[in-house]
C-alpha cells in the first residue's frame, strides 16, 4: 500500500521556535525528535506571510502571482482546479482536514472528502451583518462540540482575548477542551473511522500558537517566570512609539510594556509546547493502529510572528520572525531511503509542499504546480534548485517585497520607497541594515534587478522594467477577484 501522508500545520510559529533549531528556551521534545530523525530545512519561507495567502500556496502549489493572493483579504472565493487534497483524493487516498482551513466559503472542501473545521476567532466569520455567516456554529465544528460540553452560552471570546492581541492569560477551561486538544481528538478518531482499504492523507491544522495567547495553565506556568530573551532590536528599528501604537492590543508595530510582552512570549512558547505534547499523543495513537512506520509527516507553519522583534508584531512583513517558518519531514519507517538527520540549507517556499507530498505518494504532479519536489534532495540525487524566493505582502503603508537567498535578503517597502539589505550569513537576526554599504552595492543592485524582473507586468505598476515604482498595492490580483 502507498504511504499514508500527514501534513501537520501550525499557525504563526516562528522558524526559530524549535529546540532543534537552536532555541535553548523552548521545550519541543516531540518535534525535536521528529526533525532530528527526519529531514530538517532551515531556510523555509512563506512568500506572502499571512494566513490566507500562505494557505493558498500550500493548497495549490502555485506562486502568489498565479494563485492571486498577495495580501490578506477575506471573502474571495477559492476556485482552484488542482489542489493537494483533490490530487490525493483522485489517486485513491482517503482525505481529511481537521482544524483551520481559512478559505471561502468556509465549508469549501477544496478537494478533501471531509473537513472538521475550526478556523479560530475570525472577525469576518463572526460579523453577524456580513456575508459570511450569522450562525458561527455552521462554520465551526469545534465551537459546536465545545458548547455540547460546556453549555450553549459558552463562546470563543469568553476569556476576553482577541485573535490578534498580544494580551495573554491561561486557558479558562479544562485542558482537554482546548482547541489544540480537539484537533488531536478528531485526528485520532479519524484513525478509527477511516477506510482501512485505502491510504490516507490527513491535514492536522492547529490554530495556535496564533493569538489568542491562551495555553492551558500548565504550559503557561512553564515559561511565565523564566528569563526569556528580550526582543531583537536592529540598528534600523524605530525606537519611537509613533502615535502610541503600542497601546493598541492588536498593533502590528509599536512599543509594548515589557511586562506584558514577557507574558505574551511565555504564552506563545507555552502554546507551542502544548502543541508538541499533543502531537506526541497522536504519534502514540498512530503507533497503536500499526501505521506509524507507513506514514510520512511534514511539519510546517503558515508564517511566523515578530513577537516584538524590532518593535514589530504579528506578521505580514518580510523580516525573519514573520517570513521564515519551521519545516521538516519525518519518515519513521525510512520509506524515502534518505540520510536521516540531515539539515538542508536550500531556500524553500510553501508551494513546495504539494509537489513534495504528491511525489512521496507516486502521484502525478499537475502542470499548474510551480513548487519543487524535495524528494530528489532527500534521496541525494542530482537536482537543481532555485537560487531565491520572491516574497511580498500588500499592507497599506507597509506594503513590501523581498528577495531572499541562502545568504542574504533585499527588502523594498513600496509605498515609502525604503530599501533594506541584510547579510544573513553574518547577521541572521537582521540587526544591521547594509543598504548604504559600498561593500555590498553590486550585490544589492543584482538583487534589485531580480525583484524588478519578478514584478514586470504586474497590475499594480511596481516597475517600468528599469526601476522600482510605488505602484498601487492590492490584496488579490484581478484574475481571481
Swiss-Prot record:
Q: Does the keyword Calcium apply?
A: yes
Q: Which GO terms describe its molecular function?
A: arylsulfatase activity; metal ion binding
| Keywords assigned | Calcium, Hydrolase, Metal-binding
What positions are modified (3-oxoalanine (Cys))?
A: 51
InterPro entries (alphabetical): Alkaline_phosphatase_core_sf, Sulfatase_CS, Sulfatase_N
Q: How is it modified after translation?
A: The conversion to 3-oxoalanine (also known as C-formylglycine, FGly), of a serine or cysteine residue in prokaryotes and of a cysteine residue in eukaryotes, is critical for catalytic activity.
Task: Give the enzyme class.
Answer: hydrolase
Reactions catalysed, as given in the entry? an aryl sulfate + H2O = a phenol + sulfate + H(+)
Note describing how the cofactor binds: Binds 1 Ca(2+) ion per subunit.
Q: Which GO terms describe its cellular component?
A: cytoplasm
> Hydrolase: is it a keyword of this entry?
yes
Residues annotated as binding Ca(2+): 11-12, 51, 302-303
**Where are the active-site residues found?**
51 (nucleophile), 102
Name what cofactor the protein needs: Ca(2+)
User: What CDD domains is this protein classified in?
Assistant: sulfatase_like
Source domain of life is Bacteria
E.C. code: 3.1.6.1
The cross-references to PANTHER family, in alphabetical order and at most eight, read: IDURONATE 2-SULFATASE
Described by its record, this protein's role is as follows: Has sulfatase activity toward para-nitrophenyl sulfate, which is increased in presence of calcium ion.
Indicate the family of this protein: Belongs to the sulfatase family.
Name this protein carries in UniProt: Arylsulfatase
Native source species: Clostridium perfringens (strain 13 / Type A)
Amino acid at each position: 500500500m502507498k504511504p499514508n501522508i500527514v501534513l501537520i500545520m501550525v499557525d504563526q510559529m516562528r522558524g526559530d521556535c524549535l529546540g532543534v533549531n537552536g532555541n535553548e528556551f523552548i521545550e519541543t521534545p516531540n518535534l525535536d525528535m521528529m526533525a532530528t530523525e527526519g529531514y530538517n530545512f532551515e531556510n523555509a519561507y512563506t512568500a506572502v506571510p499571512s494566513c490566507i495567502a500562505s494557505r493558498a500556496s500550500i493548497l495549490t502549489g502555485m506562486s502568489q502571482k498565479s494563485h492571486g493572493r498577495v495580501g490578506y483579504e477575506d471573502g474571495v472565493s477559492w476556485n482552484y482546479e488542482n489542489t493537494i487534497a483533490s490530487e490525493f483524493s483522485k489517486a485513491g487516498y482517503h482525505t481529511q482536514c481537521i482544524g483551520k482551513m481559512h478559505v471561502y466559503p468556509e465549508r469549501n472542501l477544496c478537494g478533501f472528502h471531509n473537513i472538521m473545521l475550526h478556523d479560530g476567532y475570525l472577525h469576518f466569520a463572526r460579523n453577524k451583518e456580513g456575508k459570511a455567516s450569522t450562525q458561527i456554529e455552521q462554520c465551526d465544528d469545534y465551537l459546536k462540540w465545545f458548547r455540547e460540553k460546556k453549555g450553549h452560552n459558552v463562546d470563543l471570546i469568553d476569556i476576553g482575548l482577541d485573535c490578534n492581541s498580544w494580551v495573554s492569560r491561561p486557558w479558562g477551561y479544562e485542558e482537554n477542551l482546548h482547541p489544540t486538544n480537539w484537533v488531536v481528538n478528531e485526528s485520532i478518531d479519524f484513525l478509527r473511522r477511516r477506510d482501512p482499504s485505502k491510504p490516507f492523507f490527513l491535514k492536522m491544522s492547529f490554530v495556535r500558537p496564533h493569538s489568542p495567547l491562551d495555553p492551558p495553565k500548565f504550559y503557561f506556568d512553564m515559561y511565565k517566570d523564566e528569563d526569556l530573551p528580550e526582543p531583537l532590536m536592529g540598528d534600523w528599528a524605530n525606537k519611537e512609539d509613533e502615535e502610541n501604537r503600542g497601546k493598541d492590543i492588536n498593533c502590528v508595530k509599536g512599543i509594548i510594556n515589557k511586562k506584558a510582552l514577557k507574558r505574551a512570549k511565555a504564552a506563545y512558547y507555552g502554546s507551542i509546547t502544548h502543541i508538541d505534547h499533543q502531537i506526541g499523543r497522536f504519534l502514540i495513537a498512530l503507533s497503536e493502529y500499526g501505521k506509524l512506520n507507513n506514514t510520512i509527516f511534514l511539519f510546517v507553519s503558515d508564517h511566523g510572528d515578530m513577537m516584538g522583534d524590532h518593535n514589530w508584531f504579528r506578521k505580514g512583513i518580510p523580516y525573519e520572525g514573520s517570513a521564515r517558518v519551521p519545516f521538516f519531514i519525518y519518515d519513521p519507517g525510512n520509506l524515502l531511503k534518505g540520510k536521516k538527520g540531515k539539515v538542508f540549507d536550500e531556500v524553500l517556499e510553501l508551494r513546495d509542499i504539494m509537489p513534495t507530498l504528491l511525489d512521496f505518494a507516486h502521484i502525478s504532479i499537475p502542470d499548474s504546480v510551480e513548487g519543487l519536489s524535495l524528494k530528489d534532495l532527500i534521496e541525494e540525487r542530482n537536482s537543481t534548485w532555485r537560487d531565491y524566493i520572491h516574497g511580498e505582502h500588500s499592507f497599506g503603508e507597509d506594503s513590501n517585497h523581498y528577495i531572499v537567498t541562502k545568504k542574504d535578503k533585499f527588502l523594498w517597502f513600496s509605498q515609502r520607497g525604503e530599501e533594506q539589505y541584510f547579510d544573513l550569513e553574518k547577521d541572521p537576526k537582521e540587526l544591521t541594515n547594509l543598504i548604504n554599504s559600498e561593500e555590498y552595492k553590486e550585490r544589492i543592485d543584482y538583487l534589485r534587478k531580480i525583484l524588478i524582473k519578478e514584478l514586470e507586468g504586474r497590475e499594480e505598476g511596481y516597475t517600468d522594467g528599469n526601476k522600482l515604482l510605488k505602484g498601487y498595492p492590492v490584496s488579490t490580483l484581478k484574475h481571481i477577484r
